[in-house]
From Swiss-Prot:
<keyword id="KW-0066">ATP synthesis</keyword>
<protein>
    <recommendedName>
        <fullName>ATP synthase subunit c</fullName>
    </recommendedName>
</protein>
<dbReference type="Pfam" id="PF00137">
    <property type="entry name" value="ATP-synt_C"/>
</dbReference>
<keyword id="KW-0138">CF(0)</keyword>
<dbReference type="GO" id="GO:0045259">
    <property type="term" value="C:proton-transporting ATP synthase complex"/>
</dbReference>
<feature type="transmembrane region" description="Helical">
    <location>
        <begin position="7"/>
        <end position="27"/>
    </location>
</feature>
<keyword id="KW-0472">Membrane</keyword>
<feature type="transmembrane region" description="Helical">
    <location>
        <begin position="57"/>
        <end position="77"/>
    </location>
</feature>
<comment type="subunit">
    <text>F-type ATPases have 2 components, F(1) - the catalytic core - and F(0) - the membrane proton channel. F(1) has five subunits: alpha(3), beta(3), gamma(1), delta(1), epsilon(1). F(0) has four main subunits: a(1), b(1), b'(1) and c(10-14). The alpha and beta chains form an alternating ring which encloses part of the gamma chain. F(1) is attached to F(0) by a central stalk formed by the gamma and epsilon chains, while a peripheral stalk is formed by the delta, b and b' chains.</text>
</comment>
<dbReference type="InterPro" id="IPR020537">
    <property type="entry name" value="ATP_synth_F0_csu_DDCD_BS"/>
</dbReference>
<comment type="function">
    <text>Key component of the F(0) channel; it plays a direct role in translocation across the membrane. A homomeric c-ring of between 10-14 subunits forms the central stalk rotor element with the F(1) delta and epsilon subunits.</text>
</comment>
<comment type="function">
    <text>F(1)F(0) ATP synthase produces ATP from ADP in the presence of a proton or sodium gradient. F-type ATPases consist of two structural domains, F(1) containing the extramembraneous catalytic core and F(0) containing the membrane proton channel, linked together by a central stalk and a peripheral stalk. During catalysis, ATP synthesis in the catalytic domain of F(1) is coupled via a rotary mechanism of the central stalk subunits to proton translocation.</text>
</comment>
<keyword id="KW-0793">Thylakoid</keyword>
<comment type="similarity">
    <text>Belongs to the ATPase C chain family.</text>
</comment>
<dbReference type="GO" id="GO:0031676">
    <property type="term" value="C:plasma membrane-derived thylakoid membrane"/>
</dbReference>
<keyword id="KW-0375">Hydrogen ion transport</keyword>
<feature type="site" description="Reversibly protonated during proton transport">
    <location>
        <position position="61"/>
    </location>
</feature>
Length: 81
């Protein structure tokens, strides 16, 4: 395999996982903060807020997992070589 293609694949994999982790990480922090704030305002709605938060966090985390899958494909099942 061409060393330039291999280097580009490694760089693309690093960018894929890095960028895929930044957005959901910020979003999860904001969502958790808002959930804590909502529970502090309305303690009786804690169960509903917690359930919605966990579902939301799972959807956000799936974006990071998709980035990881793309990075692994670029590293080990290189489509360019």
């Amino acid at each position: 395999m061409d060393p330039l293609v291999q280097a580009a694949s490694v760089l693309a994999a690093a960018l894929a996982i890095g960028l895929a982790a930044i957005g959901p990480g910020i979003g999860q922090g904001n969502a958790a903060g808002q959930a804590v704030e909502g529970i502090a305002r309305q303690p009786e709605a804690e169960g509903k807020i917690r359930g919605t938060l966990l579902l939301t966090l799972a959807f956000m985390e799936s974006l990071t997992i998709y980035g990881l899958v793309i990075a692994l494909v670029l590293l080990f099942a290189n489509p360019f070589g």
